[in-house]
């Protein structure tokens, strides 16, 4: 079954997307797992933070375009869509600016010697978004 984006304001079809087969989903999961085990994921965090900064910059540079798409696809007021698009950029920038310190080991005092908590990824993360929020999810 194909998926469609329909403008809720006028019920006009915006775009049709093909359905994914089981093989498509399996290939995507394998690709995500390969990336999770790659040098990119296990290596220095700086290149990934640079990607988040670039994402924030790209979103900021296209607020109007992205807001128009969101309004068309979800029937939102353009002002609300602009706010959501800007929030997406702010979230990406927040993590780009703070992830390194947030993920740094935290030392705790202990009478038994050194103690600390380290943060390590445990799996790929997939999020299925609501069908009514294609841009912000």
Label every model-predicted segment.
Residues 106-137:
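Conserved small-residue-rich beta-alpha loop and adjacent elements
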């Amino acid at each position: 079954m194909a998926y469609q984006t329909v403008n809720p304001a006028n019920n006009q079809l915006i775009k049709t997307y093909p359905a994914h087969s089981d093989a498509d989903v399996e290939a995507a999961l394998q690709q995500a797992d390969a990336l999770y085990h790659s040098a990119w994921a296990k290596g220095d965090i700086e290149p990934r933070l640079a990607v988040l900064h670039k994402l924030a910059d790209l979103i900021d540079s296209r607020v109007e375009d992205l807001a128009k798409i969101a309004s068309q696809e979800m029937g939102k007021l353009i002002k609300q869509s602009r706010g959501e698009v800007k929030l997406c950029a702010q979230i990406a920038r927040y993590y780009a600016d703070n992830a390194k310190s947030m993920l740094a080991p935290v030392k705790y005092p202990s009478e038994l010697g050194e103690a600390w908590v380290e943060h390590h990824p445990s799996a790929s993360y997939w999020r299925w978004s609501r069908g009514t929020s294609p841009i912000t999810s």
